[in-house]
């Protein structure tokens, strides 16, 4: 049986965050997932404690750590003014399903995923809460991240810079084109998002073929609105024990990654993922979805099928690739000319 307990803590921080005689309008939950995280965990927890708007609860799901992660959490819970709940999985769930479990245990109106090894800027929760308070239709908001070394030194760039997610693309996300943008490729990082708990109605369970952040971003964009916040509110630590890290920036690194990973199995997974998304969208009967979303997912599935054929039938690779280019699918569902060249040479 899984072990769940509430650590010693003060009252809900919603009473501590009163400003100008008014209480915050929302209850805010932090969903923190851990696994052998003792090295950096305390620094992350202390950055949550320094928030100008404290969370109302911290829900920690530990994936059967073998180090002193639980002890670090217990010591922190004994002194912080926030309710801290710790659940230890009896068997390992993996990153995505551990986060899904943490989300399901949260009681707040807003849920903020949290990694075990980053550092939050003090205004992070206040900025995110204000975004949702200002827009009742907003389902998910995400922000940039400043990349830091294992020792906590700034690397000089941000996650969005590495992803080439500039002002034009941010503008598209913020003006109703989030689904089209996120279907092309993911720019939503779990450590840099917040979402309304109501999104879980559509998002859970999370299919095995998706990482939680990409899945939540797509479901939020399909069923509501999404906001990108051009501000690095997290110091995103890069180290060799990370399960998910920042994108590679150098052109050679990108080529090497594509050469190693864009094999037949890659496109089989892409087909599986588009089918999962298509099935889930068809099962959101009470949500008002734009008809274009269904056709876009169907078209991306067709694009993946064609790219898979290129791996199986090398003799017709060139005409297939040229056909996809004329249909504009490399631009809609990939990296444009770069993806076209990959299909010709990889």
Region locations from a protein language model:
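Nucleotide-sugar donor-binding/catalytic module of glycosyltransferases
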Residues: 7, 13-251
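C-terminal subregions of glycosyltransferases and related glycan-biosynthesis enzymes
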Residues: 182, 208-210, 214-215, 226, ...
């Amino acid at each position: 049986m899984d072990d769940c307990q509430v650590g010693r803590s003060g009252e809900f921080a919603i009473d501590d965050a009163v400003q100008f005689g008014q209480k915050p309008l929302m209850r805010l939950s932090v969903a923190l997932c851990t696994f052998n995280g003792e090295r950096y965990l305390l620094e992350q927890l202390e950055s949550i404690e320094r928030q100008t708007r404290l969370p109302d609860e911290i829900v920690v799901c530990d994936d059967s750590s073998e180090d002193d992660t639980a002890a670090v959490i217990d010591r922190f819970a004994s002194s912080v003014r926030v309710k801290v709940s710790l659940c230890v999985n009896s068997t390992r769930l993996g990153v995505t399903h551990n986060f899904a479990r943490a989300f399901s245990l949260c009681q707040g109106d807003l849920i903020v995923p949290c990694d075990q090894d980053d550092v939050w800027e003090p205004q992070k929760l206040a900025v995110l809460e204000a975004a949702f308070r200002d827009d009742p239709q907003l389902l998910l908001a995400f922000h940039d991240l400043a990349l830091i070394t294992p020792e906590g030194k700034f690397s000089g760039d941000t996650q969005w810079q590495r992803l080439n997610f500039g002002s034009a693309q941010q503008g598209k996300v913020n003006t109703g084109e989030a689904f089209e943008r996120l279907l092309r490729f993911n720019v939503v990082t779990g450590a840099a998002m917040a979402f309304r708990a109501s999104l879980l109605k559509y998002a859970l369970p999370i299919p095995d073929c998706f990482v939680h952040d990409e899945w939540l971003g797509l479901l939020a964009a399909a069923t509501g609105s999404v906001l990108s916040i051009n501000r690095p509110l997290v110091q995103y630590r890069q180290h060799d024990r990370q399960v998910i890290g920042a994108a590679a920036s150098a052109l050679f690194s990108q080529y090497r990654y594509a050469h190693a990973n864009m094999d037949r199995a890659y496109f089989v997974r892409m087909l599986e993922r588009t089918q999962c998304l298509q099935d889930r969208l068809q099962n959101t009967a009470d949500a008002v979805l734009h008809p274009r979303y269904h056709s876009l997912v169907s078209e991306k599935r067709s694009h993946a099928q064609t790219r898979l054929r290129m791996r199986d039938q090398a003799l017709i690779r060139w005409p297939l690739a040229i056909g996809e280019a004329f249909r504009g699918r490399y631009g809609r569902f990939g990296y444009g000319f770069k993806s076209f060249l990959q299909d010709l040479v990889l």
